[in-house]
Swiss-Prot record:
Protein name listed in UniProt: Phenazine O-methyltransferase PhzM
Subunit structure and binding partners: Homodimer.
Residues that bind S-adenosyl-L-methionine: 205, 231-233
Active-site residues, record numbering mapped to chain: 251
Source organism of the structure: Lysobacter antibioticus
Any one Gene Ontology molecular-function term assigned to this protein's record: S-adenosylmethionine-dependent methyltransferase activity
Its biological purpose: Involved in the biosynthesis of phenazine natural products including myxin, an N(5),N(10)-dioxide phenazine antiobiotic, which has antimicrobial activity. O-methyltransferase, which converts iodinin (1,6-dihydroxyphenazine N(5),N(10)-dioxide) to myxin (1-hydroxy-6-methoxyphenazine N(5),N(10)-dioxide). Catalyzes both monomethoxy and dimethoxy formation of phenazine natural compounds. Acts on a wide variety of substrates, catalyzing O-methylation of phenazines with non-, mono- or di-N-oxide. Highest activity with 1,6-dihydroxyphenazine (DHP) as substrate.
Keywords from the UniProt entry: Methyltransferase, S-adenosyl-L-methionine, Transferase
Membrane found in the keyword field: no
Length: 341
């Protein structure tokens, strides 16, 4: 008797079917996030007619979406046609410290559409997003402010969730000046500065992002110790930091562009400086790892990639750095530490 035929075993066909239809879940969560359902039921369960009226949806159709995702723990149907919050659904609220609503929206809109062309991407090498939209992903964001805002909110939300794991895994006490390159709204830099009251920071990103980050830094209680600088890391980065942090940045770029960023960091860095890359470092072999899926996502969006430790060594060798160590964190991210040579 095979494993698949034993009483109670889930048929392999059922397992594969669940994988094949995964996009059903993505888009159902997108509907709930986009319509703001979690905000509407945060204080108490609401009837579907009220939810439909407030969101401009058709009540019978919205009910079908909500009852389906309630079956996987996202919302609960407390009585027939009345839906309430659950711990998972609470993550889809707006403006909360642990909100994942921007991520659900981001992955359900342009990024979702790009995945329709992944076969073309694999066969031709043309980035799927560029095939779908006729421009690069960051070029698209530059022309679509709302998509850019959602992207930066999603990035900030994810980084905020993992920042404490990074701070717990690494000793930042030797550094007086911390420079975060491509920092977004600065959740990681804020966490580092809160852990090191004597340190000062510089947040570096595109001018419009750096400008928006000032308010976030003040809200985090570190605005008086952290400056913001707008610029282009392909041209130059702020000089004389004791440590340069590139968190979830190099995976947005191919090797050539990544080396350009690293060389600019090397030129700006004093001899005693450190470089910290915070990313999902790919393990060798077949073990399941979220970073392998993110590697494909970077291919689809940007023609870029996640990397192994050896691939980071190659980048460092071409840009004036030497790998010192790779430190895992509780978040799944790793801290790749390098020194200038």
């Amino acid at each position: 008797m095979t494993e698949n035929n034993r009483a109670g075993a889930v048929p392999l066909s059922s397992i594969l079917l669940q994988m094949i239809t995964g996009y059903w879940v993505t888009q159902s969560l997108y509907v709930a996030a986009k319509l703001g359902i979690a905000d509407l039921v945060a204080d108490a369960p609401k009837p579907i007619e009220e939810l439909a009226a407030k969101t401009g949806a058709k009540a019978p159709l919205l009910k079908r979406v909500l009852r389906t995702i309630a079956s996987i723990g996202v919302f609960t149907e407390t009585e027939p046609g009345i839906f309430g919050i659950t711990p998972l659904a609470a993550l889809l609220r707006s403006g909360t410290p642990d909100s994942m609503r921007p991520q659900a929206i981001m992955h359900g809109e342009e990024q979702y559409r790009a995945w329709a062309d992944v076969l073309h991407n694999v066969q031709t090498g043309e980035t799927a997003f560029e095939k779908e939209f006729g421009t690069s992903y960051f070029g698209y964001l530059a022309k679509h402010p709302e998509a850019d805002r959602v992207f930066n909110e999603a990035q900030a939300g994810y980084t905020k969730q993992v920042a404490h794991a990074v701070v717990d895994a690494y000793d930042f006490s030797p550094f007086k000046t911390v420079i975060d390159i491509g920092a977004g709204y600065g959740p990681l830099l804020s966490a580092i500065l809160r852990s090191q009251p004597e340190a000062r920071g510089i947040l570096f990103d595109q001018p419009h992002v750096a400008q928006a980050a000032g308010k976030r830094l003040a809200e985090a209680g570190v605005g008086d110790r952290c400056g913001t600088v707008g610029g282009d890391f392909f041209v130059e980065v702020p000089a004389d930091g004791d440590v340069y942090i590139l968190s979830l940045l190099l995976h947005d770029w191919d090797d050539q562009r990544s080396i350009e960023i690293l060389r600019n960091c090397r030129r700006a860095m004093p001899a005693h400086g450190k470089l910290l890359i915070v990313e999902l470092v790919l393990p060798e072999g077949e073990e399941p790892f979220f970073g392998k899926w993110l590697d494909l996502h970077m291919l689809v969006l940007l023609g870029a990639q996640e990397r192994t430790a050896d691939e980071f060594k190659t980048l460092f060798a071409a840009s004036g750095f030497a790998l010192e160590r790779v430190l895992p964190t509780a978040s799944g991210l790793s801290i790749v530490e390098a020194r200038p040579i």
